[in-house]
Amino acid sequence: MKRTAFFISDGTGITAETLGQSLLAQFESIPFNKFTRPYIDSPDKARTMVQQINAAAERDGVRPIIFDTIVNQDIREILATSNGFMIDIFSSFLSPLEQELTAHSSYSVGKSHSIGGNSNYMERIEAVNFALDNDDGARTHYYDKADLILVGVSRCGKTPTCLYMAMQFGIRAANYPLTEDDMERLQLPAVLKKHHNKLFGLTIDPDRLTAIRHERKPNSRYSSFAQCEFEVREVESLFRRENIPNINSTHFSVEEISAKILVEKGVERRFK
């Protein structure tokens, strides 16, 4: 049975959505319709939200799951009249923390993601800009400033992994696509050799790579299984020859791939 889940906040909704998504991911056998509702910061908006929740409950025949980070108690009380199963993320975690730390929390809206109060904001933006500027081997003369350089065949997940590490941890990650020319030379391109200590390889199952490439260039040599199998085989051989640590991205989320890379390379997150 498909369930409905709402991520509701009187701020950006980032915290409610991130934690809610992580919790729901533990129930792989249950499909969810997920809706994020940020800036529910007035009684009128809260009452409209109640109508949406109740409509979902009537449609599904079971109450929706509600993850919220609402600070205003009046708004919370309005939401509590809905036919939803409420999970107040802040109070669930902050109350025991307050007891352990013997201190009261500030419990402010969007605190961890605010620009003015977040010293990591500019670091995050700079890391994202670095990932975009150094995507897909477009530029290589800034590799000395990179924390990591991801290498692998085209469309194996390098770009989303670089952007995720930039957004979440402030990591400056570049990526370089290995081509047939690189494979035929049986060695790393010169620009990568001098940064060998920063390299991490991504590989992927050939059938998955074929499916991804087919969406971009259907019925082409680029997306054929034979070509994908050849490239993956040659790149994995190159990784072994050059002693480049690597991971198969096929069955992992970008979050898992990023965490494994940072642990294996020993790269410290600029912020957590």
Swiss-Prot record:
ADP binds at G152, V153, S154, R155, C156, G157, K158, T159. It is an enzyme of class 2 (transferase). InterPro entries: Kinase-pyrophosphorylase (IPR005177), PSRP (IPR026530). It catalyses: [pyruvate, water dikinase] + ADP = [pyruvate, water dikinase]-phosphate + AMP + H(+); [pyruvate, water dikinase]-phosphate + phosphate + H(+) = [pyruvate, water dikinase] + diphosphate. Its EC number is 2.7.11.33, 2.7.4.28. One of its GO terms (molecular function) is ATP binding. HAMAP family: PSRP (MF_01062). Bifunctional serine/threonine kinase and phosphorylase involved in the regulation of the phosphoenolpyruvate synthase (PEPS) by catalyzing its phosphorylation/dephosphorylation. Belongs to the pyruvate, phosphate/water dikinase regulatory protein family. PSRP subfamily. This is Putative phosphoenolpyruvate synthase regulatory protein. It comes from Pseudomonas putida (strain GB-1).
